[in-house]
Every structure is written in C-alpha cells, then in structure tokens.
UniProtKB/Swiss-Prot annotation:
This is Translation initiation factor IF-1, chloroplastic. GO terms for molecular function: ribosome binding; rRNA binding; translation initiation factor activity. The keyword Aminoacyl-tRNA synthetase does not apply. GO terms for cellular component: chloroplast; cytosol. Belongs to the IF-1 family. Its main location: plastid. It comes from Pinus koraiensis. It is found in: Plastid, Chloroplast. The gene is infA. Component of the 30S ribosomal translation pre-initiation complex which assembles on the 30S ribosome in the order IF-2 and IF-3, IF-1 and N-formylmethionyl-tRNA(fMet); mRNA recruitment can occur at any time during PIC assembly. One of the essential components for the initiation of protein synthesis. Stabilizes the binding of IF-2 and IF-3 on the 30S subunit to which N-formylmethionyl-tRNA(fMet) subsequently binds. Helps modulate mRNA selection, yielding the 30S pre-initiation complex (PIC). Upon addition of the 50S ribosomal subunit IF-1, IF-2 and IF-3 are released leaving the mature 70S translation initiation complex.
Amino acid sequence: MKKQNLIHAEGLVTESLPNGMFRVLTDNGCQILTHISGRIRRNSVRILPGDRVKVELSAYDLTKGRIIYRLSNKS
C-alpha cells in the first residue's frame, strides 16, 4: 500500500546528530529534523554534513522527515 500524503524535497545536510538523526536545510529555507530510511541503513550509505539529499515529509508534520536518497555532489 502506497502512502498518499507525502511531500518530497531536496536539501543540504547541515548537522549530524546522535542515533542516525540529521538536520537538513531544504532548498526553500526550512530546517527539518530527519532520520535515515531503512534501505539506506541496510546498504550502509554514509551521509555526512554537506551532502545533498532527497527528503520525504509527511503532510501533517513538516518539521520531521526521512532521508530517502543521497544525491551526487557535482561541484
């Protein structure tokens, strides 16, 4: 069953917190507290401050989310 009320956004990881939590600054300027999705955790993808990520947010609480993808940093 697919979740209906999800919002996708891209942002920059600004801070790494304990227990796999991260603070992400989205492109529209919102600060979000996020955690890593199970697929990223299973595949041991390393997320560091400064990485660009794709975040999934609930429509009910826009201050918390889940990191679903780490974007490549092409500077």
